[in-house]
Design a protein with these regions (language model features):
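Zinc-dependent metalloendopeptidases
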Residues: 1-224
Length: 224
């Protein structure tokens, strides 16, 4: 989830919101159990191992990511907001490896895959099934007021940044995101790792994919 003060997988186009040198200072909330520390470090490590990004413990840096636990849910600012401490929160139910990676990639500078401006060619948003008040989670990037680039990477159904089909579903428990059948799109225009019985790519996966890695490295190409 994107922190609501800047709701904006596409990467920020402006260099203003990128972390200098691909270095992201961070600080972890005091008092977190060792298991939580390990999960955070493992998630940061997998990103570092495959991209140009480096997470460094905060010393004197003004801008940094504060990794915290509270009951408020899973959210992060997108990119470097240049306001000093910026929060990445992992609440109850958020302590899953893929979810942590998802939020870390928000902090790097990426929105959701299903909010790309070209998403309507690949998925259908069933707004009639979305929980009241949660519609903003499905807005296109351009509706957020900031510019994003896809870096000419094909639509990635398997992206760790793609919501699942039941995201923010109302009490009727019907899908909110419906992938188009592969027969309706060109396989050369998309990435996917699995297909369901109806011939639709599976979404909502929580593993870092080649497409995610490629997007990050293109955004921070000056530091690769």
């Amino acid at each position: 989830m994107i922190f609501r003060s800047r709701r904006v997988k596409a990467g920020l186009s402006s260099y203003v919101f990128r972390w200098s040198g691909g270095m992201i200072p961070y600080k972890i909330q005091r008092g977190l159990p060792e298991e939580m520390h390990q999960m955070l470090h493992q998630a940061m490590s997998i990103i570092e191992d495959h991209t140009c990004i480096n997470f460094i413990e905060k010393t004197t840096e003004k801008n940094y990511v504060y990794m915290s636990y509270s009951e408020q849910g899973c959210f992060s600012h997108v990119g470097m907001v240049n306001r000093g401490r910026q929060k990445l929160n992992l609440g109850r139910g958020c302590w899953k490896f893929g979810t942590i990676v998802h939020e870390l990639i928000h902090s790097i500078g990426f929105s959701h895959e299903h909010q790309r401006n070209d998403r309507d060619s690949y998925i259908t948003i069933a707004y009639e099934n979305v929980e009241e008040g949660k519609e903003h989670n499905f807005k296109l990037d351009r509706e957020m007021g900031l510019e994003f680039s896809t870096y000419e990477i094909p639509y990635n159904y398997a992206s760790v940044m793609h919501y699942g089909s039941m995201a923010f579903s109302d009490e009727d428990d019907e899908p909110t995101i419906i992938p188009k059948k592969l027969s309706e799109v060109s396989p050369k225009q998309v990435y996917y790792s699995a297909v369901d019985g109806d011939g639709r790519p599976v979404i909502g996966l929580r593993k870092l994919t080649w497409g995610d890695v490629r997007m990050i490295n293109l955004m921070y190409k000056d530091h690769c």
